[in-house]
A protein has these predicted regions:
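Acidic active-site catalytic centers that drive phospho-/nucleotidyl reactions
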Residues: 16, 124, 145
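Short amphipathic alpha-helical segments and helix-helix/interface helices
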Residues: 50-57, 94, 127-132, 149
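General small-molecule cofactor/ligand-binding pocket signal
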Residues: 65, 103, 160
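Acidic, PIN/NYN-like endoribonuclease modules and their adjacent C-terminal/linker elements
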Residues: 1-10, 27-28, 115-120, 128, ...
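PIN/NYN-family metal-dependent endoribonuclease catalytic core
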Residues: 14-15, 24-81
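A charged helix-plus-loop insertion that forms the helical arch/lid used to bind
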Residues: 82-92
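Acidic catalytic patch
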Residues: 69-70, 90-125, 129
Length: 170
């Protein structure tokens, strides 16, 4: 199945922390020359992969959302990087959100399935809740997290692992 044809059926892209982090990291290494972060790149290591991921996100035509919990995970990651690059990383997060037309939604703990939270944590729980909340918009989750990916597949939710986007044939 071609990804571009899949996007036409899915109206909303829900982004996990991993894809956002990878896009920001690649830009930080390639544009800001923060070479100390190169070793953290896992999925987007060259311009072609960055382009494919950016193109995939853009194909949702400004219909992207994430959980406020994802922003907290980004904060914890950036806080652990070298101090001199933190402002640049935050500016890049803002740019990515603006470029994606990102909406950010709060999901309350009591709105999430307790057993899922106990197994996977509140961030993944919030993404699943967003998927359920927006079921009428045919949502798709993009993640780097294999346990979340597997749970989405098992639950019948639409999900892509970032490798399915970055490694696809052009």
């Amino acid at each position: 199945m071609r990804i571009s044809s899949t996007n036409r059926r899915h109206g909303l892209l829900i982004l996990d922390t991993g894809p956002i982090r990878e896009l920001v990291l690649f830009h930080a290494v390639s544009e800001f020359r923060l070479e100390n972060l190169r070793g953290e790149l896992r999925f987007i290591k060259e311009q072609e992969s960055y382009g494919k991921c950016s193109e995939f996100v853009a194909s949702f035509r400004q219909m992207t959302t994430t959980s406020a919990s994802v922003v907290v995970e980004l904060y914890h990651w950036i806080r652990e990087t070298e101090r001199h690059g933190q402002n640049k990383l935050w500016r890049r997060v803002y740019e990515e959100f603006q470029n994606m037309g990102m909406d950010e939604e709060v999901v309350k703990l009591l709105e999430m399935d307790a057993s899922f939270i106990m197994r996977f944590g509140p961030v993944d729980g919030s993404l699943l809740e967003l998927s359920r909340r927006h079921a009428g918009r045919n949502p798709m989750i993009l993640t780097t997290d294999l346990p979340l990916y597997g749970e989405c597949k098992k639950s019948g939710l639409s999900v892509y692992h970032i490798d399915e986007v970055t490694l696809k044939e052009s």
